[in-house]
Amino acid sequence: LRSTQDPMSYLLGFDAGRPIQNSFGGPEIAGRPFYNEDFTRLNFDVRRGSLAQVLGEIADHLHDPRPPTYYVASLLVDGALPGFSQANGLPLAEHDIDAPPSIWIGNRVVASCHFDEPNNIACCAVGRRRFTLFPPDQIANLYPGPFDPTPGGQVVSVVDFDDPDHDRHPRF
């Protein structure tokens, strides 16, 4: 890759042009989609738009020290990016794995610790991403948040892993 624009252009080459769900948060959320102070609302907006719009907004803020947060979560590849799977796919069906491929696109976003129902294969193609895995018996020590609302459809840990409050979360 010569630049961040290269993978954006590559994705747009497969774009079906359908409206997609995407999320936006102002610079004040510092890339961390989460709850408000009393856990009654989320600190970001879910909207509908085009992939070109989202990628354009990401590109507009590539060099901002505190950019707004933009992401597209679990976009089903075959419907939104026809041909992408054939050009980049994992041969899952050859191994009797029935899993529709999805893609996650965003800028500097920190996803809170959560449990994904599907079995995932994670691959960071552009940029950097850290995945921290915990055994199931540690769930209580991760302080799960409320069932509704949720930042991504599943319950997330309320602990800020980058700045944990050990008084509020002593078992973390």
Name each model feature, range by range.
Residues 1-172:
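N-terminal accessory scaffold of Fe(II)-dependent oxygenases
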